[in-house]
Amino acid sequence: MGNMPSLTDNILVVGYFLIWIATFLWYHHIKKEVDAGSMVIGSYIGYAFFSIITLNDTFFNIRYDHLRFIPFLYLYIMLMIALSPAIYLHYNQPDKIEDPHSKTLYIPCIALIISAFFQIPTAISGSESSMIQLITDADAGQNAYLEQISNKAESGSSIKNLPAVIFNVLYDCTTFLFFYFLTRKNKNKLFLLVLFAAIFIGMILPVLNGQRGSVIKAALTIVVGYALFRHYLSKRINRVVQIAGITMAIIIAIPITAITISRFSDRKGSDGVSGYVYWYIGQANIYFNNSAMSAGGIRYGDRTLNLFKRLIWSDTPKNYDERRDKYRNLEIDDYYFTTFVGDFALDFGPIASFFIFFIFNLCVLFEIRPRDGTIKLHQLLLIYFTLCICMQGGMVLFSYADTANLIIVVYFLLYAWLRYHEALLKRFPLAGKE
């Protein structure tokens, strides 16, 4: 852009912000209940607001081109398609979850707990920064972050920390199971307390490595999980979860603030740290508008389906450095945020991505229709999967890309087990019960 944004640019970005406010009002017009869909739409309103701010920042607007109407329209349609399962559940909320009667669901939770506690000694001894250092040393967060970036640049070809891999792969699904267990009448309180501690560890460990992104992702996952099951939790459990959530947010906020200051305080231009924070939160909508639909080529699934492609084609890039080098002809890469929609558009093109979104979410809508006033756990898992994609990727990129394709595999296995187990119960009621 090189200069202040034009009136048209501001009309478009403000219009995009207002359409999400209108969507939020429409979403709650008939049914006032706040749920997971409310959280996702609310986050999109926030991101659009910060897009307005960073677009008009005299330091950052030189990074942007002038905005166009069609990309914003396309982005809105794609995000609404991705949200369609949550919207359907909002207006067709069953009052009861059918219990799958499976003790097997404890297995991934136990694996998460074990892997979480195995990581603690390594994280503490191997970290460049302790929690105290992050708060007191202005350079500690930056040093830890640079160390992690160096490690990631060489990652993708081998497993260096098996407990961390297991933990990260299981985190989203076990968060889902944690909130489901809270809805049951007979609760193992000690088990739930230990599982909660393991989930909280998932927010602490990235802080020690100077990472904000992983903490934010974990927090958004917890918010989605709680909001999805909130309707089925007792008033007392809701209160306890809300108090625990506020406490977690306070504990995490201090080191995250310190990391942010450490990362951006030495950079010139803009309004200090705040300008970089606004750019960090608000850039995705603008970069999507500028380049995601017309980047000068596509990546053929090398990011969104990276691990699956590597099983078939050995020349598939193993990490983001290799991928950026391979597709250096594109106008934009994954150094910048373009939302999860942008990731798919860059991988497959806007037309193919539309059909991928439409067909997948149509299948989900067909599958999640509740019957007899109850909803099954595998149906809720599908909705949770789509919500995590929407919530985690609304500000950044597709969160299940690269080696995180393994998380999709875990989702599939859990979904298949829940469906198979229920079918077995119907066919052999006594043999299937655990």
Give the location of each predicted region.
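N-terminal "leader" segments that precede or initiate the main folded domain
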Residues: 1-105, 109, 114, 195, ...
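Hydrophobic, aromatic-rich transmembrane alpha-helices
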Residues: 18-30, 171-185, 355-370, 424, ...
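Hydrophobic alpha-helical segments
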Residues: 333-342, 346-434
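Small-residue-enriched transmembrane helix-hairpin modules in multi-pass membrane proteins
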Residues: 3-8, 138-161, 251-365
